[in-house]
Amino acid sequence: MEALVYTFLLVSTLGIIFFAIFFREPPKISTKK
């Protein structure tokens, strides 16, 4: 059970970071273009 919680936490953190970068980059590129 502990391993599952740790895995979920790791995936959640990675997902949030990837989502933030993916959402923050397009607007910049669009504005620059």
From Swiss-Prot:
GO cellular component: chloroplast thylakoid membrane; photosystem II reaction center
Subcellular compartments: Plastid, Chloroplast thylakoid membrane
Positions of post-translational N-formylmethionine modification: 1
Residue intervals passing through the bilayer: 3-23
InterPro entries: PSII_PsbT (IPR001743), PSII_PsbT_sf (IPR037268)
Keyword line: Chloroplast, Formylation, Membrane, Photosynthesis, Photosystem II, Plastid, Thylakoid, Transmembrane, Transmembrane helix
Membrane topology: Single-pass membrane protein
Any one of the GO BP annotations: photosynthesis
Recorded family membership: Belongs to the PsbT family.
Summary of the function given for this chain in its UniProt record: Found at the monomer-monomer interface of the photosystem II (PS II) dimer, plays a role in assembly and dimerization of PSII. PSII is a light-driven water plastoquinone oxidoreductase, using light energy to abstract electrons from H(2)O, generating a proton gradient subsequently used for ATP formation.
Classification via HAMAP family: PSII_PsbT
Assembly information from the UniProt record: PSII is composed of 1 copy each of membrane proteins PsbA, PsbB, PsbC, PsbD, PsbE, PsbF, PsbH, PsbI, PsbJ, PsbK, PsbL, PsbM, PsbT, PsbY, PsbZ, Psb30/Ycf12, at least 3 peripheral proteins of the oxygen-evolving complex and a large number of cofactors. It forms dimeric complexes.
Protein name: Photosystem II reaction center protein T
Organism: Spinacia oleracea (Spinach)
